[in-house]
Regions:
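His/Asp/Glu-enriched, well-ordered alpha-helical/loop segment
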Residues: 1-107, 122-125
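Short glycine/proline-enriched turns and hinge-like loops at secondary-structure junctions
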Residues: 43, 113-115
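Short, small/polar residue-rich loop motifs at catalytic or cofactor-binding pockets
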Residues: 84-85, 115-117
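Glycine- and charge-enriched low-complexity intrinsically disordered segments
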Residues: 131-141
Length: 141
């Protein structure tokens, strides 16, 4: 995503507080990721990539990047926490809603210059709600 016009409109005095994920984490505050669609893309893998490769906007600004594990937790457990749904969803565990995605590719390469991961299957409340056209057609229980 291009930095302009965002950084100019925001003003340098606010830069240290923008996307301050590491600072928030360091204070023990749970982090929940989502989307500001249509302002930003509706693609969690893109958002995770941004959190992994984010660089300070100036040399005197703090590094606010998160690890892949922290990003995945922000989308799963963090989302459940934000919606008061920790006992309902947010993890793969017995008794919780069966919400999950199947990713084709290496998640650990999202921060590389050539990421190759893509979502090929999405299950929400135990039902398939998205299946990539090139995914083998099989029955899912």
């Amino acid at each position: 995503m291009p930095l302009e016009p965002t950084i100019s409109l925001m003003g340098r005095a606010r830069w240290p507080h923008a996307f301050a994920w590491a600072a928030i984490r360091d204070q023990g505050v749970p982090i929940a990721f989502g989307t500001d669609w249509p302002v930003s893309p509706l693609d969690p893998l893109f958002a995770i990539r941004c959190a992994l490769i984010r660089r300070p906007w100036a040399d005197d600004m703090p590094d606010q990047r998160l690890s892949l594990r922290e990003c995945l937790a922000a989308y799963s457990q963090g989302g459940a926490f934000a919606e008061f749904g920790e006992g309902v969803f947010g993890a793969v565990a017995a008794g919780l809603a069966a919400d999950l995605v199947l990713v084709d590719g290496a998640l650990d390469r999202l921060g590389s210059t050539r990421p190759n991961a893509r979502v090929v299957l999405t299950v929400a409340a135990g039902r398939v709600v998205h299946m990539a056209e090139d995914l083998d057609k099989r029955e899912y229980a």
